[in-house]
Amino acid sequence: MADEELEALRKQRLAELQAKHGDPGDAAQQEAKQREAEMRNSILAQVLDQSARARLSNLALVKPEKTKAVENYLIQMARYGQLSGKVSEQGLIEILEKVSQQTEKKTTVKFNRRKVMDSDEDDADY
């Protein structure tokens, strides 16, 4: 019993130390993610005009997956030189429509009706 308690205390202490000091691997990963986010933002700032950036940030609040797809599309177009100048709000709307058509989900509803033994004899008619 003492061994189990000692092991539990060791695990708790180890968890406290890791939480306090942080894992060095996590710090490197967070720094890499932060650099990537800064690079994405700088590319998008060069590619989009003010109104398009505002629309994209509003979309990010509602649909983050779609925003990520549009950002990736814009960054890819910028890297390959397919953009001539900054993308306006109207251009962003057209890109959003293209992405929406590509990722459109078809929903189907299937009714699964259960067959229940129902007898009217048990029901009391009032």
UniProtKB/Swiss-Prot annotation:
- Positions the record marks as coiled coil are none
Keyword Phosphoprotein listed? The answer is: yes
Locate the region Disordered: 17-36
Question: Sites of the modification N6-acetyllysine?
Answer: 63
Tissue-level expression reads:
Widely expressed.
Name the domain of life: Eukaryota
Q: Which residues carry this modification: Phosphoserine?
A: 51, 119
- Kindly state which keywords UniProt assigns to this record, in alphabetical order: Acetylation, Apoptosis, Phosphoprotein
Residues modified as N-acetylalanine are 2
Gene3D superfamilies membership: PDCD5-like
Acetylation among keywords: yes
GO cellular component assignments: cytoplasm; nucleus
Question: What's the family?
Answer: Belongs to the PDCD5 family.
User: Entry's PANTHER family?
Assistant: PROGRAMMED CELL DEATH PROTEIN 5
The free-text function statement in the UniProt record for this protein reads:
May function in the process of apoptosis.
Indicate what this protein is called per its UniProt record. Programmed cell death protein 5
This protein's gene is called Pdcd5
